[in-house]
Structures are given as structure tokens and as C-alpha cells.
From Swiss-Prot:
The protein, known as: Maltoporin
Entry GO terms, CC: cell outer membrane; pore complex
CDD domains membership: Maltoporin-like
Location(s) in or outside the cell: Cell outer membrane
Description of what induces expression: By maltose.
Species, as recorded: Shigella sonnei (strain Ss046)
One annotated GO biological process: monoatomic ion transport
Origin organism lineage: Bacteria, Pseudomonadati, Pseudomonadota, Gammaproteobacteria, Enterobacterales
Gene: lamB
């Protein structure tokens, strides 16, 4: 008994050391932004986004606290074979109080197995919820190729002239299909699962410093037995993507062309939508009808222009043409130059313009937005974070159309459709006005 008791402190110390080593091996990554702002005409900070545009210029124009907290660990390794477990919990609140409760979103929980297939060295097998090979424009927070969700796949297969990746993911729509509930009345409360099958060929070196990535995504509604799609629903669709990435001026330029059909046009990023119905006030259902096509031409990048200047930029044209004439044409162009006073202090300006034309009315909405920010950041790159900035933003807009959400779909045939700003004596869109805001914000990724 004496020997056992003497060994106990040593056993505890060894166990603590092992647990400490394991704890230190956990990878902690994430993203967060938060701050405080005011509006020139009074009240809390307002943010500005053009009606019909799918994003906004974000510098000095974010009104929420948002965070993603990622924990992951390599849980097994033998030679070059390994298993990695990855998780991500995200949340967003209105940024108006000390205590703001919200339900977190469990966005990632997956396992990735590397080099598990002997005849496919360098490849990765994965399954679970995952941010899957996302492509975005940072300065407008716009994801143009993103099939994230629960799924499985095999990626980075070396085919000699590039890397091949195969994946299947899922998203769902509330009320997407129906069955008879009682008295021959359709019940729209069931969710419809939308599956996406993704094939990508990346890292093809086609010119000095330049690579090409090609992708095809097919999305379709996957109905339960004895269910039917609502009338006019879009059952499936395709998205084709070509992206050229060029190393230039210590940075990069990406040129992207995308074409989508039917259910892949609404979000335009690779997730299928359109098989479902939406609910206004949780009472009346209206169809999401997006049969048609989408064309997107996009150029964006980040470059260094000497020791003291960096710049982000974006230019995009997007045409969503729907059979029901409720599509849009969206042009956007913007720049974010940065002047570095010291390795940790800079002045940043962002200038952005959006123009959105309604297919149904032919009218246009436009907005100019400019932000000037003084910033302190952890490094001398435009990508350096964390950053603390104080900013002032001015926006001016003129909107000639908006979406009609008055009443409900049972009595309003225009519900959810684009209408002129003064339709039927009403007021749709944001009109013709301007505003300025100011505040402070932190942003970090790690």
C-alpha cells in the first residue's frame, strides 16, 4: 500500500502532462468582428445595401457582432496517414446591448482523412458538415462559389496536370414539398432536401504565375416518398465555373466566369434553391419560382503598390434572367486603398458603387458609398489582423423600385415581386436620400 501511494503522485503528474500536451495540440482558429457606431441623423449605426444587390461594401458598414470559433485537432497519425477532426460554432447578434442571447449555429463538424488511399497519394477523404473550398470577395463579403453544408467527398486527387475534387453536400428549404394532411388540404410544413454534386479540377498551371480552376455543380430537390413539389417549383439546375488566378504585384488577381440554370440561379454560388415555398407571417405560402439562367463575370484581387500602398478591388456584372421576369442585373465596382504610416498603423479608404436593374420594371437602384478609416493592425499587409479602426461612412442612394411584401400572397398577386417605387400609391425601395455614420470596430481572424 505504501508503494502504491508513493506511485500515485507520479501517475497524476504523468497524466496531467499527457493531458496538457494533448490540450496544447488543439488548433484554435476563428473570425470575429464587433464595435459601436452612430448615425448622423440620430440613433444607432445604420448599414447601407442596395435593394436587389446580394452584398454590400463592408468597411465601416457592418452593424452586428459576428464570430466563428473553430476547434480542431489531428487525432491520429501514422507515417503520412492522418485523421483530423474540425468544428466551428458561429453566432451573430445585433450589437445593441451587453447581454444579447442567440442560438449559436453549428456550422462545421467533420473528419478529414489524409493519404488513406494508397493509390491516391496526397488525397483527402472527408465527411460531415464543412466549409468546403469556399471562394469569396472579402471587401464585399460575397461568396460566389460555396456549397458548404453536411456532406462527404474526396479531394486533391493528383491527376498530373491538376488536382481533382469530388463532393456531395446538402441544404434544405422550409415547406419545399407537400402531401395531403387532411380534407384534401396540402400540408407545406415539410422541408425539402436539396442535394448538390460538385466536381472541381484545380491548380492547373496554364501560364507563368497563373492557374486555372474549372467546376461543375448539379443541384436537385430530393423528395420524400409520397410528397410532391409545389406548382411551378424549380426541381434542379446547373452551375458552371471557370476561375483564373494570377500572381501579380505581390498579390493576386482572380477572373471568374459563372453560368447557372434554374434552381442554381437564386443564390448563384452552388447551392440549389427553388423547390420550396416561403412563408409570410407563417400563414401564407408563395412559390419560389426561379426557372431561368444566371451569368456572372467577376474580377477581384489584392495587390501591393510599393512599400506604403496596398489595395483591394472588385468589379462584377451579374445577370439573373428568370422566366417570371423577377430577375435582376447587378453591376458593382469598388476599391479599397490602404496607406501605411508605420508597420502597424494605416489609413484605409473604401469606395463602392452598386447599380441593380429590375427585369420586371426596367427601373434601376443605385448607391455610392465611401468610408475613411484610421486603423491599427498587427502587421503591414492589407490582410493583417487583428485590426482596430475608427471610421466615417457616407452613402447616397436613389432607388426606383422595390419588392412588394404588402398583405399576403392570397390577396396580393404581386407579393414578393419587383414593383416601381410609387406602385399603387405606395412607397417601395429606399427612395432618394443619403446618410452618414461613424464609429469604431475591431476585426480579427486567426
Amino acid at each position: 500500500m505504501m508503494i502504491t501511494l508513493r506511485k500515485l503522485p507520479l501517475a497524476v503528474a504523468v497524466a496531467a502532462g499527457v493531458m496538457s500536451a494533448q490540450a496544447m495540440a488543439v488548433d484554435f482558429h476563428g473570425y470575429a468582428r464587433s464595435g459601436i457606431g452612430w448615425t448622423g441623423s440620430g440613433g444607432e449605426q445604420q448599414c447601407f445595401q442596395t435593394t436587389g444587390a446580394q452584398s454590400k461594401y463592408r468597411l465601416g458598414n457592418e452593424c452586428e457582432t459576428y464570430a466563428e470559433l473553430k476547434l480542431g485537432q489531428e487525432v491520429w497519425k501514422e507515417g503520412d496517414k492522418s485523421f483530423y477532426f474540425d468544428t466551428n460554432v458561429a453566432y451573430s447578434v445585433a450589437q445593441q446591448n451587453d447581454w444579447e442571447a442567440t442560438d449559436p449555429a453549428f456550422r462545421e463538424a467533420n473528419v478529414q482523412g489524409k493519404n488513406l488511399i494508397e493509390w491516391l497519394p496526397g488525397s483527402t477523404i472527408w465527411a460531415g458538415k464543412r466549409f468546403y473550398q469556399r471562394h469569396d470577395v472579402h471587401m464585399i463579403d460575397f461568396y460566389y462559389w460555396d456549397i458548404s453544408g453536411p456532406g462527404a467527398g474526396l479531394e486533391n486527387i493528383d491527376v498530373g496536370f491538376g488536382k481533382l475534387s469530388l463532393a456531395a453536400t446538402r441544404s434544405s428549404e422550409a415547406g419545399g414539398s407537400s402531401s395531403f394532411a387532411s380534407n384534401n388540404i396540402y400540408d407545406y410544413t415539410n422541408e425539402t432536401a436539396n442535394d448538390v454534386f460538385d466536381v472541381r479540377l484545380a491548380q492547373m498551371e496554364i501560364n507563368p504565375g497563373g492557374t486555372l480552376e474549372l467546376g461543375v455543380d448539379y443541384g436537385r430537390a430530393n423528395l420524400r416518398d409520397n410528397y410532391r413539389l409545389v406548382d411551378g417549383a424549380s426541381k434542379d439546375g446547373w452551375l458552371f465555373t471557370a476561375e483564373h488566378t494570377q500572381s501579380v504585384l505581390k498579390g493576386f488577381n482572380k477572373f471568374v466566369v459563372q453560368y447557372a440554370t434554374d434552381s442554381m440561379t437564386s443564390q448563384g454560388k452552388g447551392l440549389s434553391q427553388g423547390s420550396g415555398v416561403a412563408f409570410d407571417n407563417e400563414k401564407f405560402a408563395y412559390n419560389i419560382n426561379n426557372n431561368g439562367h444566371m451569368l456572372r463575370i467577376l474580377d477581384h484581387g489584392a495587390i501591393s503598390m510599393g512599400d506604403n500602398w496596398d489595395m483591394m478591388y472588385v468589379g462584377m456584372y451579374q445577370d439573373i434572367n428568370w422566366d417570371n421576369d423577377n430577375g435582376t442585373k447587378w453591376w458593382t465596382v469598388g476599391i479599397r486603398p490602404m496607406y501605411k504610416w508605420t508597420p502597424i498603423m494605416s489609413t484605409v479608404m473604401e469606395i463602392g458603387y452598386d447599380n441593380v436593374e429590375s427585369q420586371r420594371t426596367g427601373d434601376k437602384n443605385n448607391q455610392y458609398k465611401i468610408t475613411l478609416a484610421q486603423q491599427w493592425q498587427a502587421g503591414d499587409s492589407i490582410w493583417s489582423r487583428p485590426a482596430i479602426r475608427v471610421f466615417a461612412t457616407y452613402a447616397k442612394w436613389d432607388e426606383k423600385w422595390g419588392y412588394d411584401y404588402n398583405g399576403d400572397s392570397k390577396v396580393n398577386p404581386n407579393y414578393g415581386k419587383a414593383v416601381p417605387a410609387d406602385f399603387n400609391g405606395g412607397s417601395f425601395g429606399r427612395g432618394d436620400s443619403d446618410e452618414w455614420t461613424f464609429g469604431a470596430q475591431m476585426e480579427i481572424w486567426w
